[in-house]
Amino acid sequence: MAPAGGDIEAYAAQCGGAVTGTMQTGLRRRGILATGAAFLATAASAPGLRVQELRAQELRDRLPGQEVAPILFVHGNADSAALWMHTIWRFESNYYPRARLFAVDMRLPAARRAETARDSSRSSVAEATAQLAQEIARFRRATGIERLVLVAHGRGGNIVRNFLRGGGAARIRAAILCGAPSHGMIVSDTHMVGSEFNGASPFLRSLNAMPGGVPSGVPVYTIASDQADKWAQPDGQFLGLPGVATGISHTGPALRGATNIVLPGIDHLETAYSLAAFTEIYRIATGEAPTLARIRQEVKPTLNGRVSAYEAGAPTNIGIAGARVRVFAVDPGTGQRIGQERHDRITGPDGAWGPLDVEPDFHYEFELSVRGYPITHIYQPPFPRGSDYVHRRPYLPDRDDPRDGALVTVVRPRGFFDFGRDRIEIGGQAIGGALGVPSENTLRATSTATAAAMPVQYNAQRITGRTWPIAQRRVTVIELGE
């Protein structure tokens, strides 16, 4: 909805941002909080007041009697809260209060291979649900608001439904499930037996026994791909079972009792972390389309996060003490360090490596040293806004790693590479891959040069890192933003 006194295109131009429209023609839904239009109209008409300078606190001040819903974001299998960073930035850029946005880090984010098999490096459904309940209680205490909105990706969506089924529904305003394997990744008595991702498991059978697959009293929304989610496929190729019928269709994430939203062409990760997904999440939470698609810069962003590692090959979100994090500003064209390090810290028991104030348009290198792992040099785009979710894990060695030269890993954390859609170059060489359903978000390259610029082009995004000698147990990780 356009602000009073002008159209939305003019207003967006004033703010320097693009306009994001509806992703589904004719889709109408009642928002959890219809605040956006009223706030923007007031802001735009205030004499002499720059919209860009309004703080999120003023959203509450200008809407007496209305409550800004807290939103808790839950990541998927083997992931971390860091994946929600851009989504949170986009909410903030549309003047949602930072204090009402929180992303949970599941301590052991990877699911057990079988629910009944004890595994200290992975979590069961019961363990993950118990931690989610604790995080919800903590968030409610922090905000002083009884009911909140849950937004979950992948495995997190099923954990949210389990929490709601177990008595948590009274504390939730709405649940938004993005790319959740609602009916499993396979339905089988012979494959993935005991896995929480098997639709024949006791867990999913009981979860889907609820009328419509959802608890009463809580609006539930699903966001899914039309056919490009690797975990909602009729063939078991991505489960290591090519040619085996999974019993799951492209509509696997949908639930009969939910409002089901389908976004064409997006992959499994993009069901939660893409701009298209954000538009739907924001619309559900506020009742309005976001006004800004771009991420607004802060004058002086402050970064922080946690260093974690792996246990028995599975990632954890448990902080590590004694890790060293050095941060350097780098030349965006060469990856060369500019001056001395901007930050140098040894982590304490909680694994926190910050805080660090940065320039919003600078490129940085993070040098991460964790006992037992290669020194990891991480290069990524500038940070336009501050975040407490700039988490770091060291590179996990692979038996196929080279013994000499340099190793470069390119990661797209919030989406898979689509070789039929994306332009990808590493070191000036075009990278191709299998067409069809996007399924990989990590690319590896080797180089004989051990101290050279390594530019990576991903569509319009360009990041240049440096190669490091693997013989010195050093590797390069180039992390894409979008």
Regions found by a protein language model. Give the residues of each.
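Short, acidic Ser/Thr/Gly-rich low-complexity loop/linker segments typical of extracellular
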Residues: 331-352, 463
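N-terminal secretory signal peptides
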Residues: 1-27, 34-44, 52-53
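Structured interaction patches on ligand/partner-binding surfaces of diverse proteins
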Residues: 343-346, 369-402, 462-476
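Beta-strand-rich domain onsets/edges
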Residues: 281-302, 311
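Short, ordered, surface-exposed loop/turn motifs in non-cytosolic proteins
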Residues: 310-338, 416-436
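A short, amphipathic beta-strand motif
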Residues: 301-313, 405-417, 422
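Serine-dependent carboxylesterase/thioesterase catalytic core
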Residues: 71-77, 81-82, 86-90, 96-97, ...
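Short Pro-Gly-centered beta-turn/loop motif in secreted/extracellular proteins
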Residues: 349-365, 371-372, 439-453, 468-472, ...
